[in-house]
Amino acid sequence: MSSQCPFSHLAATNLTMGNGAPVADNQNSLTAGPRGPLLAQDLWLNEKLADFVREVIPERRMHAKGSGAFGTFTVTHDITKYTRAKIFSEVGKKTEMFARFTTVAGERGAADAERDIRGFALKFYTEEGNWDLVGNNTPVFFLRDPRKFPDLNKAVKRDPRTNMRSATNNWDFWTLLPEALHQVTVVMSDRGIPASYRHMHGFGSHTYSFWNEAGERFWVKFHFRTQQGIKNLTDAEAAEIIANDRESHQRDLYEAIERGDFPKWTLFVQIMPEADAEKVPYHPFDLTKVWSKKDYPLIEVGEFELNRNPENFFADVEQSAFAPSNLVPGIGASPDRMLQARLFNYADAQRYRLGVNYRQIPVNRPRCPVHSNQRDGQGRVDGNYGSLPHYEPNSFSQWQQQPDFAEPPLRINGDAAHWDYRNDDNDYFSQPRALFNLMNAEQKQSLFNNTAAAMGDAPDFIKYRHIRNCHWCDAAYGEGVAKALGLTVEDALKARDTDPALGQGGLL
């Protein structure tokens, strides 16, 4: 490592206050005599203290701990028959981008190497506006209805009494949502602790839509395959790393980019014709399900490379704001309930965290012209469009709507009601069963051991509940988890009749 000062190239400058006035003394406070009290007229002390207590902004409710980098996306294959989005308009086209990778459940001070999902958020600065793809390193999630998302957050965060993470709360919640078993199986598998952000895949997870110049709609899933190869950590390896370095993932990403070892991912899509959504044997908009790659194979699109670290972490990573509602012509949403809720909730979270004008922060600012009647608000710094009219319609030919970019109509029918997913699709186990059966014996044993370790001191009735769910998924799955927990499947099946949650819909 070089011993040279990293700022040796900068010319000496003078320290000023926030208003530009010179700071005469930055070492000693203004006092009445050498041993007297402070004076209220010490303007620089007042400013430093006032700014200091306001430096921390609200942390993200989820995905609080993260790392980021800038890069470039390059199109390598033609998909214009599926989408009119200009980011994909020609082979060889390059688009600047920013990526943020995260843990999910932990706070800003959490260790990078914890067993957890990893966030995989990408912002593409396209000529038609910013496109945000806000995904994870897993293709599925615990939930399929957003009503339970705040509850998930509370279950995996700190207990309101002890202020500690609670295996009881966590597993009580998961085991009463049988649809969560698919994601639980992923998180408790070897892939539950990636060795680094560079060595994991990414997924859009949700079903999105494409539409082309002819107005044809296709449903789409996004997959990002790491070109560095998959590498994971065992619980023991992760514990050793955490004991010495809580920023292991951030350090790995930053140092790789600094030495010119730029990480890359290949983008693939799965494409489903619009009409197929009513024909497939599974719910194509269910976030707890994946699509068959046999029926809808991966189609290569391009690759992205991360090649520039932020100059200031707070400015670019902490203030980066991602929202699935940041879409561009040719890329749209779907009836996925979880996605529908995120279309509002994510942008609203950024308004709370960063203010209504968060899009003016450089890392979030579109690279294309922005002509909007949205005005004023705290932190407006772009001139606020001066004296231009801020209403529409107006008589001055200003900023007309663009009907050529309208999304094709989507046929929707049905009565408005609180429709229960379980009445529509109660196949909780076929896909986690398929995943389990893809594992070799060693991987299955890791799954059993990791599950037992994660369940920790949760009460037996919760452990029995999870054993039952695993048993109904696959007998060998249930048997393996039971043995790792020092319990039996037989006792778990008997324990159902005395489960405290008896009568709840999620108790199977």
Swiss-Prot record:
Which CDD domains does the record match to this protein? catalase_clade_3 (cd08156)
Named cofactor requirement(s): heme
The reaction(s) this protein catalyses: 2 H2O2 = O2 + 2 H2O
Question: What's any one GO cellular component for it?
Answer: cytoplasm
Active-site residues per Swiss-Prot or TrEMBL entry: H63, N136
E.C. number(s) listed in UniProt: 1.11.1.6
GO molecular function terms noted in the UniProt entry: catalase activity; heme binding; metal ion binding
What this chain does, per the record? Decomposes hydrogen peroxide into water and oxygen; serves to protect cells from the toxic effects of hydrogen peroxide.
Q: What is this protein called?
A: Catalase
- Gene that encodes the chain: katA
